């Protein structure tokens, strides 16, 4: 059966978690995601054709103006994102295709050939309180491993000072345990993890940060633990690295974090080196509605302009480096708004089904 390109639409939330507060804005239906159709010249989706979309992933980042650093948020419930492809929908639905960004005529305030790259490590293994949504990763004890190393692959670092931020939790009764974080010879530590025998706290949380020059093609971080007694325990929540990186297209997909300078009356010009093989560069500041940037080529350097009204994010990529999706099967049409008024909804697991009823 021939599939009409114009009748293809993609839906999904990009994998992001819905807000915890019930009075925060949230979509009433699955959002429509803009896609790019490659090979749609004959109007039919053939074997050699493809559609591309920006899959932002389940974890998210936001810029903190107060700390002048990026902050990440791990999805509390899922490590996978799900999308729904409609192949027999109405034709040419408004907002279903990626459009060109508006040509920027504002004066250029910043010429950018570097950005603040970012990576984080966080795993969810231990729930200290056996309750809630706060989980921790690597565990320290007085008998087990007391040193954990983390390597972050960030090529083309320019040597400027970057940041390593981490958060830990610890439990030591009747003594004091120390935690240390080291990067490029600089150490941050906390020496006040100590609980009294009568304390109602299960553990104490602390944050560690170092500001240190970073160069080369990666950042190595070491977390260590000095237990105060045989019963002392500790856990790593996350380790996050941010370092100034040259804009060099070093892989099939390269993400660019825009200028931190805000100006409604000016633009920034970005310069991406070694990028002659790049097929497209999208503005993904709004992950559900990417925009296709106007590109200029100067040898192996690709340039484009963007407004500085917000902290923008971009992705440069080659078609051949796009990741494939994993098909999950077909889904019958559902009337999600036809359930009528519900007074109470209880979500549970089979083990607790009888109690929930």
Q: At which residue positions do the language-model features occur?
A:
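Structured catalytic cores of large enzymes
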Residues: 4-354
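Mature N-terminal segment immediately following signal peptide/propeptide cleavage
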Residues: 1
């Amino acid at each position: 059966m021939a599939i009409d390109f114009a009748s293809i639409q993609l839906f999904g939330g990009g994998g992001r978690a819905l807000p915890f507060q019930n009075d925060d804005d949230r979509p009433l239906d699955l959002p429509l995601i803009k896609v790019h159709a490659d090979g749609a010249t004959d109007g039919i989706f053939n074997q050699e054709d493809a559609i591309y979309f920006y899959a932002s992933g389940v974890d998210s980042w936001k810029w903190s103006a107060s700390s002048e650093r990026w902050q990440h948020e791990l999805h509390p419930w899922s490590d996978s994102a799900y999308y729904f492809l409609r192949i027999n929908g109405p034709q040419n639905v408004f907002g279903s295709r990626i459009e060109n960004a508006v040509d920027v005529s504002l004066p250029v305030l910043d010429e950018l050939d570097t950005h603040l790259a970012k990576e984080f490590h966080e795993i969810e293994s231990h729930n200290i309180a056996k309750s809630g949504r706060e989980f921790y990763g690597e565990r320290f004890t007085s008998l087990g491993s007391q040193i954990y190393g983390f390597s972050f692959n960030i090529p083309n670092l320019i040597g400027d000072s970057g940041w390593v931020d981490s958060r830990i939790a610890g439990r030591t009764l009747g003594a004091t345990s120390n935690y240390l974080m080291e990067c490029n010879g600089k150490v941050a530590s906390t020496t006040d993890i100590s609980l009294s025998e009568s304390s109602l706290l299960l553990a104490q949380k602390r944050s560690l940060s170092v500001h240190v020059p970073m160069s080369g093609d990666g950042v190595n971080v070491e977390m260590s633990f000095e237990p105060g007694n045989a019963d002392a325990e500790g856990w790593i929540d996350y380790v996050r690295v941010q370092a100034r990186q040259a804009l060099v297209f070093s892989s099939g997909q390269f993400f660019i974090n825009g200028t931190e300078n805000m100006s409604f009356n000016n633009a920034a010009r970005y310069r991406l080196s070694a990028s002659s093989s790049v097929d497209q560069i999208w503005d993904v500041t709004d992950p559900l509605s990417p925009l296709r940037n106007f590109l200029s080529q100067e040898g192996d350097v690709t340039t484009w302009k963007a407004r500085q009204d917000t902290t923008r994010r971009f992705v440069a990529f080659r078609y051949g480096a796009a990741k494939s999706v994993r098909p999950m099967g077909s889904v019958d049409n559902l009337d999600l708004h036809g359930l009528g008024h519900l007074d109470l909804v209880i979500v549970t697991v089979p083990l607790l089904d009888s109690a929930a009823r």
